[in-house]
């Protein structure tokens, strides 16, 4: 049985009844089709498609259209070919639509004629297509031609990067046993439709849904909701959201009427309510809680769930179900609507469980605190709850797994799937007395102030406050809990905070609250978290800078904050003053409230105040006041304080800094002409060291490079040097608040890491740091250069953490920077396809070079010629002469270049690797190909030279070694994909790298395993080998796993010396200079950590 057969069988009985109505909401009569007209239009389309499509494989047809009267007939027409329909939303970002079409390898797309110009303009830059000369009524058929099977998109790159392991993460182990019976999507008529997940929690997944998977949903809901030909069902979901399939086919397979309205009407609550419940008398509504909330509590109570409503069935799903308290407040007196909680995931399309709220609970005056259970499995569905070890959970907390014999879908590149496959949902639940209660998604479980918190709890408590119409909570930048409120009345924030304090534990109280007119929602009807984050960013930016006009005003406002946060008695006339000797902890404060007070004071003063937290926790109100006065009102202190401010988003940016000009510092070293050479030493990921004219610098310093791999250093510059004691940490530097710090993990051995400083970039930092050591007026100085997804490149002083300059580029930055041969320029790639050349002492833009796609590859400098080499996702490698501001040569490498080029001095070769799996050796002077080898799978890892060999990691889990003439010497097999680049030891005897199997590996130069160390997550970053300077024979290795842990190992044995956890994911690679480790983090910060040995006061 198929979906179309289900409709055909029903339609034959109800040919003259209304099947579909489309109401544009313009006070004109709706357009309606009977079942007879529906089938006739579908049949005409299917004949047209059969005549003009030559599939030659899996039959899938894209459908690019807006909701309209023809929508059901178009879907039926495609299904009757038979083929699967693949909906494409014209309002989606073109990059997402392109990714979807490419990933599905769609050969045909039906485009609604009204959307033709939009389709062409959105996709002409990345697609080659020919329009079939024959058109069909309101549709045009496009045949797509994908060049060489490749279209480079940002999403595609992200998907390639993670697809290998993601599928294994989501399919349970027992599903992969060979004896299982399989479902094969290549069988004729197997597939019904193809969708993609939203991508809000990662890379969008392609989900191909068989008829056998979705049919049980249709059959069960028809029975559960008791659907008849008298019912009217509303198409609330967009085609790209799989609940739309249930809405369409439950209606059309029952002889009922399907009501469709334009997308523009769905965002107008009053008009939508009028159309649904006055004009058409809708009887069955399946929607997300967010869509329902948009009506507002008054409209819900008076119309949607009134005593006389037409609505028989309300099924809420796709998000956490509202609390019973809220639900009961929405119901008008005498309402009899049946209300269901339905739950499911797109990967097991569409719904998995249902629970009807008992009438006696809805009518009860007793307040129910417990959440609503998920209920029973739907027809053919199996639900399991497992702990982190995969064992069944009968009581307690675990993750939901969903499946069933035929309830299986094909994810991404899967062609066959074992029947009964169970998919991990990422949703956590509690099992109590045999019932399952939803807790939240994995990403809604956060660790805050050292305690586990489900942010859904905050939303539930806030929503139950009488002043709150609706609300949402976000974990902004993984560091601030923000409550967004749509209010019924004018609100005073302090009143809400006081109410929340009565019902929430201290660690669950929001950091901030924003009042908004309405909650933004996605096209799927869910709360749009990314839009909320933008609203909060705008809210922060719009806050006026607080300028205190004297110490008296500070004292008054400090009194107000003190009383407000401690919930002291209200004083309308402000006559009750807080005694000056009051101590915060003795007055009802705690460590969490002290954090809020600190945040409010820093917002009041517009700057961070070193040492204030300790004063709040240990001293009197007067001491707090005096500490602030000293920091804010003394010019010297104010100047010092601004230099170390990390909370930049709460203060106005310096105009010079925003323009990329140097802020607060003179030039880092003399501003030479482009042709003149500064003496510099540059360190970058993988222990790569570049020494450029550094003889004078090294002589001045009386020292040399850290022990590390020197393959980029001209032999004339390599020397054996003494160690350097690092500068002592600046006593004025203040550690950031504890809840934002990384924390050393218990059990660290003989070594520790301590935060020296951190610098806020505004968004995730995936690039790796470049450290440049130079002499400024005969005084050595080291600068960290790094870019972030905030579009900015920062130059930061290594010792103090002081920002030397910031420069805003045109888009996100994932590329790591390199230094020019003269030392005067920093070169970095950008998502907008440009390569930027910036002056190293000021950040001023010196030159930009344009490629045809994103540049994520990190540039490399040729120390002999000064040429800059870089790869682009436009599949070309480029050689740039930055002094002449010209491209010397470019070469098509037959695949996008994500990894960084590698320069070999002997022989003089340039090595490049592509996502198409090619490793190329090029002539650096001309760009001609010396040789190329196919590695079979994408190469994200960057090539690395040592002795007479070159090695590189591959996503098939292999570390490959070649000679400089291109002969493969050996292949080492890791247990998972390798994205990490190799790091070579100082003696060039060992090679270190990480793998997605969660291990750090050490191989001999001959490709034999020396040791491997298991971390707690995937190892994406490149390790860094260095020496423990007080004991120069103590060789160490620093590496990072994606869960934010930094690992310091003994490089000869793999023995753990220390581990430290950052408060965010890490894809940046560490770089170590002397005893300071620098790395970027996805919590928006660059971190510098001191390596401490034995006695914590002695640095490594």
Swiss-Prot record:
| Entry keyword set | ATP-binding, Fatty acid metabolism, Ligase, Lipid metabolism, NAD, Nucleotide-binding, Phosphopantetheine, Phosphoprotein
Record keyword Ligase present: yes
- Record InterPro entries: AASDH_AMP, ACP-like_sf, AMP-bd_C_sf, AMP-binding_CS, AMP-dep_synth/lig_dom, ANL_N_sf, Beta-ala_Activ/Resist, PP-bd_ACP
One matching Pfam family, short form? Beta-prop_ACSF4
Is Coiled coil one of the keywords? no
Q: What is the top-level taxon of the source organism?
A: Eukaryota
Which residues belong to any copy of the Carrier domain? 552-632
- Return the annotated region ranges for Disordered: 162-181, 643-671
Q: Which residues does ATP bind? A: 197-205, 427, 441, 526
Summarize the record's induction comment: Has been shown to be up-regulated by a lysine-rich diet. However, levels of expression have also been shown not to be significantly changed even when diets differ markedly in PQQ and lysine content.
Q: What is this protein called?
A: Beta-alanine-activating enzyme
The organism encoding this protein is: Mus musculus
Which gene codes for it? Answer: Aasdh
């Amino acid at each position: 049985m198929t979906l179309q057969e289900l409709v055909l069988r029903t339609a034959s009985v109800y040919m003259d009844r209304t099947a579909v109505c489309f109401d544009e909401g313009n006070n004109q009569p709706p357009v309606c089709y009977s079942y007879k007209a529906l089938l006739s239009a579908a049949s005409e389309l299917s004949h047209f498609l059969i005549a003009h499509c030559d599939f030659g494989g899996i039959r899938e047809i894209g459908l690019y259209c807006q909701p309209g009267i023809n929508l059901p007939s178009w879907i039926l027409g495609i299904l009757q070919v038979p083929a699967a329909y693949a909906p494409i939303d014209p309002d989606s970002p073109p990059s997402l639509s392109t990714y979807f079409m490419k990933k599905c390898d769609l050969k045909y797309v039906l485009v609604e004629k009204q959307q033709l110009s939009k389709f062409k303009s959105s996709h002409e830059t990345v697609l080659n297509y020919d329009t079939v000369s024959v058109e069909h009524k309101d549709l045009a058929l496009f045949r797509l031609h994908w060049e060489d099977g490749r279209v480079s998109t940002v999403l595609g790159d992200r998907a390639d990067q993670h697809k290998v392991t993601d599928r294994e993460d989501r399919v349970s182990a027992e599903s992969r046993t060979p004896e299982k019976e399989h479902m094969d999507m290549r069988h004729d008529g197997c597939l019904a439709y193809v969708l993609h997940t939203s991508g809000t929690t990662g890379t969008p997944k392609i989900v191909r849904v068989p008829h056998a998977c979705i049919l049980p949903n249709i059959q069960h809901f028809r029975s559960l909701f008791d659907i008849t030909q008298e019912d009217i069902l509303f198409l609330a979901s967009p085609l790209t959201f799989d609940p739309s399939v249930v809405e369409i086919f439950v209606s059309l397979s029952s002889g009922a009427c399907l009501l469709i309205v334009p997308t523009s009407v769905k965002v107008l609550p009053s008009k939508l309510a009028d159309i649904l419940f006055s004009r058409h008398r809708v009887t069955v509504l399946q929607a997300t809680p967010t869509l329902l909330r948009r009506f507002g509590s008054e409209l819900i109570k008076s119309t949607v769930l009134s005593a006389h409503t037409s609505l028989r069935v309300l099924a809420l799903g796709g998000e956490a179900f509202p609390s019973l308290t809220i639900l009961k407040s929405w119901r008008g007196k005498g309402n009899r609507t049946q209300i269901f909680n339905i739950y499911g995931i797109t990967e097991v399309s569409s719904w998995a469980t249902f629970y009807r709220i008992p009438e006696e609970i809805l009518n009860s005056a007793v307040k129910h605190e417990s959440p609503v259970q998920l209920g029973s499995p739907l027809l053919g569905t199996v639900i399991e709850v497992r702990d982190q070890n995969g064992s069944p959970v009968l009581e307690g907390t675990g993750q939901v797994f969903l499946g069933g014999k035929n309830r299986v879908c094909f994810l991404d590149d899967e062609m066959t799937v074992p029947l009964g496959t169970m998919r991990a949902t990422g949703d956590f639940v509690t099992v109590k007395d045999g019932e399952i209660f939803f807790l939240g998604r994995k990403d809604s479980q956060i660790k805050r102030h050292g305690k586990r918190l489900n942010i859904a709890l905050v939303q539930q408590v806030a929503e139950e406050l009488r002043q709150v119409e609706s609300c949402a909570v976000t974990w902004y930048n993984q560091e601030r809990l923000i409550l967004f409120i749509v209010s019924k009345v004018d609100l005073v924030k302090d009143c809400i905070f006081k109410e929340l304090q009565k019902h929430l534990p201290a660690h669950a109280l929001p950091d901030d609250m924003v009042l908004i007119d309405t909650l933004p929602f996605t096209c799927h009807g869910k709360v749009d978290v990314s839009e909320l984050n933008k609203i909060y960013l705008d809210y922060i930016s719009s806050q006026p800078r607080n300028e205190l006009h004297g110490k008296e005003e500070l004292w008054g406002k400090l009194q107000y904050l003190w009383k407000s946060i401690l919930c002291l008695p209200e004083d309308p006339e402000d006559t009750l003053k807080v005694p000056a000797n009051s101590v915060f902890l003795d007055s009802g404060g705690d460590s969490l409230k002290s954090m809020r007070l600190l945040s409010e004071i820093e917002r009041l003063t517009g700057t961070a105040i070193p040492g204030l937290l300790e004063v709040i926790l240990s001293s009197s109100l007067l001491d707090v006041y005096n500490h602030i006065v000293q920091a804010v009102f003394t010019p010297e202190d104010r100047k010092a304080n601004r230099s170390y401010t990390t909370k930049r988003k709460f203060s106005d940016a310096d105009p010079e800094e925003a323009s990329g000009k140097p802020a607060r510092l003179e030039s880092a070293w003399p501003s030479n002409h482009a042709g003149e050479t500064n003496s510099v030493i540059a360190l970058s990921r993988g222990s790569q060291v570049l020494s450029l004219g550094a003889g004078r610098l090294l002589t001045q310093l009386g020292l040399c490079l850290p022990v590390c791999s020197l393959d980029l250093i001209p032999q004339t510059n390599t020397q054996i040097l003494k160690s350097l004691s690092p500068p002592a940490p600046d006593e004025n530097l203040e550690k950031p608040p504890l809840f934002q710090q990384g924390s050393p993990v218990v059990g660290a051995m003989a070594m520790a890491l301590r935060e020296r400083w951190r610098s806020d970039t505004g968004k995730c930092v995936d690039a790796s740091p470049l450290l440049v050591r130079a002499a400024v007026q005969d005084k050595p100085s080291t600068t960290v250069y790094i870019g972030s997804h905030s579009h900015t490149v920062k130059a930061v002083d290594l010792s103090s953490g002081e920002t030397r300059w910031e420069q805003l580029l045109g888009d996100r930055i994932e590329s790591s920077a390199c230094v020019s041969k003269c030392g005067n320029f920093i070169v970095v790639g950008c998502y907008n396809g440009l390569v930027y050349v910036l002056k190293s002492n000021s950040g001023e833009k010196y030159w930009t070079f344009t490629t045809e796609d994103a540049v994520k590859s990190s540039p490399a400098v040729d120390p002999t010629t000064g040429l800059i080499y870089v790869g682009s996702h436009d599949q070309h490698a480029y050689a740039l002469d930055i002094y002449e501001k010209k491209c010397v040569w470019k070469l098509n490498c037959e695949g996008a270049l994500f990894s960084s080029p590698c320069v070999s001095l002997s022989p003089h070769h340039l090595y490049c690797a592509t996502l198409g799996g090619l490793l190329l050796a090029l002539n650096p002077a001309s760009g001609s190909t010396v040789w190329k080898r196919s590695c079979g799978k994408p190469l994200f890892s960057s090539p690395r030279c040592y002795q007479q060999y070159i090695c590189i990691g591959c996503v098939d889990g292999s570390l490959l070694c070649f000679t400089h003439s291109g002969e493969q010497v050996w292949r080492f097999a890791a247990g998972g994909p390798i994205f990490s680049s190799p790091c070579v030891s100082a003696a060039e005897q060992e090679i270190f790298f990480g793998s997605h199997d969660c291990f750090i590996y050490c191989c001999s130069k001959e490709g034999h395993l020396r040791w491997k160390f298991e971390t707690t997550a995937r190892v994406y970053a490149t390790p860094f080998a260095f020496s423990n300077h007080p004991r120069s024979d103590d060789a160490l290795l620093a590496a990072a796993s994606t869960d934010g842990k930094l690992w310091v190992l003994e490089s000869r044995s793999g023995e753990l010396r220390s581990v430290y956890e950052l408060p965010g994911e890490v894809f940046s690679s560490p770089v170590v200079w002397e005893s300071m480790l620098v790395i970027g983090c996805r919590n928006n910060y660059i971190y510098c950590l001191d390596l401490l040995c034995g006695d914590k006061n002695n640095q490594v």
